[in-house]
Amino acid sequence: AKVKKSEYAWVAKTLNNQEFALFSKQPLAEQRHAIDVALEIYNQQNLVKSLYGIDQYNNLLKAALLHDCGKSLIKYRLRHRVIIVLTRYLPEKYKNNLIKHRTALGRILLLDNLHPKWGRHLAAKAGANIDIQKLILNHHNPSNQVEQLLAKYDNKH
């Protein structure tokens, strides 16, 4: 995964200094993913602004860049990432059973389940507004159209 200097400049312009520091703590693969998600929103900006307004567009863009920042608290290995992707479509009941019985697979799934909460907390500490925090918190369980848009592009990349 690579990030161009021009992309870092765009991210730095989009986020405040504390948010950019938080973005920069993410592994390179997460930074690339976050930029790809944010670019989807950027490329749809006219539609997003007309549907939800400029403030929500800006919140969505920032949330896209920071939505997985909670993962920066954990050292994910490649095999962990593969497991998470492969188990994404397992029924929740089955995943919860693995977590409940403290299996090795369950531990990986638990950490993945917690990253939105950790991300919300880190974003709050970085000065992100409550709407951005909620977008980060709910990016795997969207409850409104704006959250669904973030989830859609997150799942695409």
PLM feature spans:
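Divalent metal-dependent catalytic cores for phosphoryl transfer on phosphate-bearing substrates
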Residues: 20-157
